[in-house]
Amino acid sequence: MTNSTFSIAKTTKPFGVQNFGIIEKILRNRYGFFEEIREGIDLQAKMKAMLISSVTFFALYGAVMGASSSLWQTMSSAVKLPILFVATLFVCVPSLYFFSLLFGSNQSLSQSLTVILTAITVTSVLLLSCAPITLFFLLTTPSQYQFFKLLNVAIFSISGLMGIVFLYQGIKVVSGSEREGATTRKWVLIMWMFVYAFVGSQMAWTIRPFIGAPGTPFELFRQLGGNFYSNIFYSIGEVLGLFIVR
């Protein structure tokens, strides 16, 4: 075996390791990662690795959520949770990209998409890191459906908030030298974050359930009606003993 062949064999990593390795790169050196996005370095490879990693992590956490009910619910949630985030991404990306262009941004669509995927990947990592906590409460409070639902809402909120922090930092770095319309783009980004959260919560409500209700047969989807926010309000009321959700 020649030295060059040995070198290739030594440095080549398995496909999965290459994709999941990007997680460590983001978490350890986020600003260096954002600088690479600004320079347009390996954007396609970055997007592919982050998409594979985040879909995998979302599927694993979705399976933990669905495990509260049945095997069918476990498999359903493992499929639907990645769909939720990917669908929300593609619904919301065009608005951020074109509004940013309108107010002077020079970012390409690939750069914008890569930064947003970074935020989604961070969210997926944090969700998966909370999976043992979710599993613990699943095993120790098996009959507390509303509590388990609120626990997951809290975990999603915290993980999503950290993802938004990464998104905000990433946009600032990638847009670093662009002064024209910088203040307006900042407010566009802030408003877009609220839109993204609203679309995501409504999307989740549309393709629910992710957690099967006790005593009910498996449902792939539920009938539309009500909304996410009122349901959370009633769930809080039931947990506090104020009333019972029917």
Language model regions located:
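Helix-boundary and loop/linker segments of multi-pass membrane transporters
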Residues: E39-G40, S70-L71, A182-T183
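A glycine-rich, hydrophobic loop/mini-helix early in the fold
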Residues: A45-S112
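N-terminal juxtamembrane cytosolic/stromal segments of multi-pass membrane proteins
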Residues: M1-L51, F228-R246
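Hydrophobic alpha-helical transmembrane segments
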Residues: G21-E35, A59-L71, V93-N106, A131-Y145
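Long, intrinsically disordered, low-complexity regulatory segments adjacent to structured domains
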Residues: V188-W192, Y196-R246
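Sparse recognition of residues in long alpha-helices and their boundaries
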Residues: A45-K46, P132-I133, Q223
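Hydrophobic alpha-helical transmembrane segments and adjacent short intramembrane/lumenal linkers
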Residues: K80-I83, A87, L96-G212
